[in-house]
Regions:
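Substrate-binding pocket helix/loop in short-chain dehydrogenase/reductase
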Residues: 111-113, 117-125, 236
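Residue(s) in the substrate-gating loop at a strand-loop-helix junction
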Residues: 156
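Canonical Rossmann dinucleotide-binding motif of NAD(H)/NADP(H)-dependent dehydrogenases/reductases
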Residues: 17-47
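C-terminal substrate-recognition "lid" of short-chain dehydrogenase/reductases
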Residues: 16, 94, 133-136, 244-273, ...
């Protein structure tokens, strides 16, 4: 009985998101799936959002079978109405929203600026920067009314460097997200609202494959081969210093810390998780 009581006590102690409601975008795979899974295991009620209907519903079903209180919503983050619906779904289902994880992202396949057409630029920024801004815009009033809340954005080391982690559009979008993170943190700290970002390096996800399918633009195929060869060679020099990719679960643990009360005085921070890649 004593052993059982200790286990129950220990379980309660590690439920860092008990009684919290979290909304995770890009939850069908990769970092988003790992974050949603970990948050649910830590006691949160989780709304999983993704454009991949089959994928997000499968992840949700898997978590429900394990006794987690979760639901899914299929959205296109480039549509403002879908973002509004996503937030309202969380409120309707669980009565509150405590944590917003802006994780949906798209990669630009390292296309340099001279070969970036408007379609590629606008697509990448709409998903990587405009969508998080809109989600935050809809969430802030809810957080203010509730007396606080937490936002965690999935940035990238590309938001802290010039070309190491992506092409022109991707780098610009992630720099913008880093700036947005700091802006939100400073402007709304008096309402007990925290906004931070995790900046991963290389992670073992399917973002490249998903991005190839999503990018309907000539840029991905129209980059001058000579330019691309030079750029790829330079980027590969950085890869050589840090060849191990992170597992999505490693990034999820960083997001968990930032979302939890353990990070109560962490606000406006960009937490790099890149295995020392940018330390070189």
């Amino acid at each position: 009985n004593k052993e059982k009581g200790f286990l129950i006590f220990t379980k309660k102690m590690i439920m860092r998101l008990k009684d919290k409601t979290a909304l995770v975008t890009g939850a069908a795979s990769g970092n988003g799936r790992a974050i949603a899974t970990l948050f649910a295991q830590e006691g949160a009620k989780v709304v999983l959002a993704d454009i991949n209907k089959e994928g997000v519903e499968q992840v949700t079903a898997d978590l429900q079978q394990k006794g987690c209180e979760v639901l899914s919503v299929v959205i296109d983050v480039t549509k403002e109405s879908d973002i509004e619906q996503m937030v309202s779904t969380a409120i309707s289902a669980f009565g509150r929203l405590d944590i917003l994880i802006n994780n949906t992202g798209i990669f630009d396949m390292l296309v340099p600026v001279a070969d970036t057409d408007d379609a590629l630029w606008e697509k990448v920024l709409s998903i990587n920067l405009t969508a998080p801004m809109r989600a935050i815009r809809y969430t802030i009033p809810i957080f203010k009314e509730q007396g606080g809340g937490v936002i965690v954005n999935t940035a990238s080391i590309a938001g802290l460097t010039g070309a190491r982690g992506g092409g022109a559009a991707y780098v610009a979008s992630k720099h913008g997200l880093v700036g947005l993170t700091k802006h939100v943190a400073f402007c709304y700290k008096e309402w007990n609202i925290r906004c931070n970002a995790v900046a991963p390096g290389r992670v073992d996800t399917n973002i490249r494959d998903n991005s190839k399918k999503a990018l309907q633009t000539s840029s991905k195929d129209g980059c001058l081969s000579e330019d691309m060869a030079k750029i790829t060679e330079k980027i590969a020099m950085g890869y050589a210093t840090n060849q191990r990719k992170a597992a999505p679960e490693e990034i999820a643990k960083v997001a968990l810390f930032l979302a939890s009360d353990e990070a109560s005085f962490v606000n406006g921070s960009i937490l790099v998780a890149d295995g020392a890649w940018t330390a070189y």
